[in-house]
Amino acid sequence: MKLRFLFAFLALTLLPATLPAQTAETSGKPFVVEYYYKAKWGYADEFLQLFKKNHYPLLKKQVEMGRMLKVWMDQPRYHTTEDGRWDYRVTIVFKNSTVANEPFDEDAIKKQLWPDQATYLKEEQRRFELLLSHWDLPVRTMDLEGK
């Protein structure tokens, strides 16, 4: 019993000391997130049109600001099973993990890019109504030549 308390005490006191070192090590490197979109059958083109009109300009603005380094979209060349199907994958390379995870106020940019907020909000709602699912996947590149 005493050994368990000692272990818990050591874990709680030593663990926080290792976290800043890990964060500092990775915070300077680009941070990549893949965003997957699976549209309802027959609505992928409408989703893409709304994405390009109402979301891509916001992403491009963040690239211009330096928050993101690069943004691109991929589409599968061939079909797959329904459970594994996705229609679009947007890959965003953030400047670093800190920038990717800290709060960012997009509202001012949205109001600048889309002064007619009522139309913008209606179209954004429609864009998400067209989806069956959407998921985000942070990824890291593996060095196959290293250890």
Q: Language-model features: where?
A:
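Bacterial N-terminal signal peptides that target proteins for export
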Residues: 1-7
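Bacterial N-terminal signal peptides
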Residues: 7-17
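Boundary of Sec targeting at the N-terminus
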Residues: 21-22
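An amphipathic, aromatic/His-enriched active-site/gating alpha helix that lines ligand/cofactor pockets
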Residues: 26, 61-69, 83-85, 91-141
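Acidic/histidine-rich, surface-exposed loop or edge segments in extracytoplasmic proteins
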Residues: 27-42
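Primarily extracytoplasmic ectodomains and periplasmic/lumenal surface modules that are beta-strand-rich
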Residues: 41-46, 98-100
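Short amphipathic alpha-helical segments
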Residues: 43-70
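A cross-kingdom feature marking solvent-exposed beta-strand/loop segments within repeated
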Residues: 75-79
